[in-house]
């Protein structure tokens, strides 16, 4: 009896999902490693500006629902078991109940099999955006970049649009798209000026804006509307901000780059800060280490810290041993000082940092 009931519930859920998909003409799946939340917000704002009744959904620890009819966002309250891709069915139901014309969702799946379930059995997006292919979640998606690209490529839609950047895997993605009768649009960063990016009060990379602009192109939305719409997007809670701190005796700039969890994104942030002509001489670099992400710390040791001329490197959080060992072994000739504040409380961290500012 239990098996029969489960089968009936499964069929009902599948039928409801199909009905809800048919009610929402535009469905956008934002995939990739870094910047998905920001791109989701930019696209949601473009579609809203263009007059579509649009619902957006970001994921992660600060998951949000965004609605065309209100400025406030709804915080997604997770069930006790934590994030689960089944919540996407509830998002789909909510958007359909509101009679939304467009649904823009950040892919919340990391496991390659779950990514395919998210795309083909839940959202059924007719526009897929692959933001980038970077080294992260290697334990689940890797261990190589090729395997990460394969996971993203598997989510390319049939008879739809693929929006992505020009990268080492562009031709690979194009071949899959061709086999699936899907049109490819490559984001054009030349359309995004520094003057435009300076209008945001948080850091936006050219890729973020050009990808959103390309989605507008796929839907026939004029560029003026796209540019105007993006400026209306609220920043993600984890968005990177540059903040000046201090007083008449202290002029210090704090760059919140903790949202960047992979080497390339972190180095890109550093290069972008230099491009914007902030003072980057003798910086203090703070690395937040996590016990469940020791592999990430090790990657930063090999691929990030040697590339940044650093006055002081500070390790906080848990399991900073890879950094300590590398510094003691002379792997960071570019780092003048190293301070290990593993497991230190915030007050202790600030007490240590204040004399250095």
Regions found by a protein language model. Give the residues of each.
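Short, basic phosphate-binding NTP loop
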Residues: 1-31, 38-50
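Structural beta-sheet core signal
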Residues: 56, 128-130, 164, 284-287, ...
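Short, charged/polar "capping" segments at the starts of alpha-helices
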Residues: 64-66, 113, 168-174, 292-296, ...
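Acidic, Mg2+-coordinating active-site environments of NTP-dependent enzymes
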Residues: 98, 125-246
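Short, conserved loop/helix-junction motifs that constitute active-site signature segments
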Residues: 119-125, 154-159, 276-280, 303-311, ...
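Beta-strand-turn-beta hairpins that frame and shape the catalytic cleft
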Residues: 245-254
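Active-site beta-alpha connecting loops in nucleotide-dependent enzymes
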Residues: 258-333, 338-342
